[in-house]
Amino acid sequence: TDCPPHFYSAGENPLYPAYKKVIGYINEVCARFEGSRAEVRVAVLYHAEAEWSGKKFMSVDKVAGELLRRQIDFDIIPEDSLYSSEEEGSLQLNGNRYAVLIVPRREYLPEKLSRALETVSAGTEVLYAKESRLASLGKYLQGKGLASVDFMGQYPFIRARKARKGGKDIYMLHNEHPSAAVIRWKVAGCT
């Protein structure tokens, strides 16, 4: 028996003929992003405590879906990180300063969390998301220039990631729709 199974086998495994191409693509993407820094300016609070409380809450997935449809890059951060932000009066984690923190709707907001959100709000805009207002939240964030790319039109199935490396912008776009898409976007400094 072959234990563990060898998927790659130097690209010669007949069960996985395209595996060599997949690995080559992954290596290319990793090489391009190696040493880069993502420019993430939006954080979404993951409220595990709200999920455990038995009270009503909005899933982080709903907020994430709206942000993804609008090409707004974000980090999901745990509640604990608000208590240890690197800078008083704003949300800064791992050298990344967030312009906006989104708090998904929850029925109960603990006093400790409420105080932390108040402290963070001095330098980071804190927005409370509701299911009925997700589309307007996405539009608001786009209007603030927080999308990774400035598309000329709506492309809800395109996912975008922007990073900087060596003073240059790097973009990764991924189409999650089964059909091809032709997109146009504005890039600073280009006409």
Segments and roles (model prediction):
Residues 1-191:
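Carbohydrate-binding surfaces of carbohydrate-active enzymes
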